[in-house]
Amino acid sequence: MRAKLGLAQCLWLSGRYDESLSNYYDILKLNPNDNQGVRYLLAICLAEIKKYDDLEKLLNSKEYKDDIMAEWLWTKLLLSYVRSGDSSETNICLKKALQANHYMADYLTGRKKVPQYYSDCITIGGEDEARCYVLDAIDAWEKVDGLIEWLKDKTSLNENK
């Protein structure tokens, strides 16, 4: 499973996106409980190449729709903004995402600089979790017109309360 994951990641980095996605999906079929966290990587990949229908299917799949990990909630926020813009639904997604990890906003908006290395361990809700997510997901976020500016506006309002 780890070898197949490594292959999927290498294929992605070499620009062979369809082959990479196929490997990610294969891993999830072989291991639907996904103790490797492959769904998080797959979701970011789908967002990065704007396969939003496929991303929506993954996020809402019966296996993972109730996932409350920060990576999942922040990627749900991205999709909600793509689909609905600054809507009540998107604002609810933002609230849930901030509750899961409020550090994400600072790194996604550039208020804090992301080091170019991954942490050795991840603390749920911690800055290290935020840094790792942003290292993987920033390209997807930057491809959505207005999303980072919207996040900056929404979270700066929260800071002033």
Where in this protein do the model-derived segments appear?
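Short coil/linker segments at helix-helix boundaries
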Residues: M1-G15, N33, R39, K95-A100, ...
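Residue-level signature for tetratricopeptide repeat
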Residues: A3, C10, A43-C45, L79-R83
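Structural motif corresponding to the intra-repeat A-B loop/turn of tetratricopeptide repeats
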Residues: S14, I49, R83-S84
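Solenoid-like repeat scaffolds
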Residues: Y25-P32, L59-I68, L94-Y103, A137-D139
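Short, charge-rich amphipathic alpha-helical segments embedded
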Residues: D26-A47, D106
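Active-site-proximal binding-pocket segments
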Residues: A47-L58, D66-W74
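Long, ordered, amphipathic alpha-helical scaffolds
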Residues: L78-K161
